[in-house]
Amino acid sequence: NVSEDTSKTDSETLKDLHSEKKNVPTMGGIIILIAIIVSTVLWCDIFNIYILLVLFTAIWLGILGFFDDYIKLTQKHSSGLTSGSKLFFQCGLGLIIGLILYFHFKDIEEGTRLVIPFFKGVRPDLGAFYVLMVMFFIVGMSNAVNLTDGLDGLSIGCTVIAGMAFTLIAYIVGRVDFSSYLQVPYIAGAGELSIFCSALVGAGLGFMWFNCFPAQTFMGDVGSLPLGGILGIVAIIVKQELLIFFIGSIFIVEAVSVLLQVCVFKITRKRLFLCAPIHHHFQFKGWPETKVTMRFFIIAAIMALFSLITLKL
């Protein structure tokens, strides 16, 4: 149980650092989801299978996050849904999406193949393991974004940067000419995701106006869980799954830092980092919150640009 073990490694110092935030309203992610869904319904082809899948993912994880936040707010001293419960529903979603995409893609030449950055001629066919990969990316990214949501503006800012990158990638893979020139898989209908990702960016920027330091509202799990799931499924649909490790590098590092912290603590009873996720480690070293956030933004932007460059390499 990663989250519960992680909480045991936290210290009172973290509570002191964030003591002034205890009265800031949360569940602002509801507004993000509403903005994304309304924009998508207005401007996208809602009968497009990929649009339906990303909307389904957003709503499923949004409901899961809503109940988690609601329990935290209404039941004192509660940490919300158990980690096992959340993981069960996340895996359930991943399985459903994975099976749908597997049967949708299996008759398409590039359908269940994995595109390897830098090696455009190497595209191993995952076969039935494709379903497990889909589950891994949706569950992993959902939790990674959730773990990153610990500093004012950090998670939503990195999400906006990732959304911008996927907007361009979705447009490219949805066009025969561009995808042929760059030698990336052409995915008919995936161009609609560029509109969806644009809605994600717009909603994210609107929320960031109120979430940047000092935050006037937090997104809560109702925002972070679906945003992570969206990034995961978009990467899968546009057949650039491994690019998520560049585009979402901050999220990946945050999640890995927690896993390492837990594993090392269980084995040695000592902390690898002063506190996990890693953004708290830098806070403990004396970095101001805004400096941590801005430096993470810079890294996220550089890695997103690098991911776009790989399309031409």
Where are these regions (language model features)?
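Membrane interface segments of multi-pass transport proteins and intramembrane proteases
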Residues: K72-T82, I116-P124, P288
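Interfacial loop/helix-cap signal at membrane boundaries in integral membrane proteins
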Residues: T9-L17, G111-L126
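Alpha-helical transmembrane segments and their helix-start/interface "positive-inside/aromatic belt" motifs
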Residues: L81-G92, D152-C158
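Alpha-helical transmembrane segments within multi-pass membrane transporters and channels
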Residues: N1-S3, I63-D68
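Juxtamembrane helix-capping/reentrant segments at transmembrane boundaries
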Residues: T6-V24, S79-K86, F284
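Alpha-helical transmembrane segments
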Residues: D5-T9, I34-I63, I97-L114, F129-V134, ...
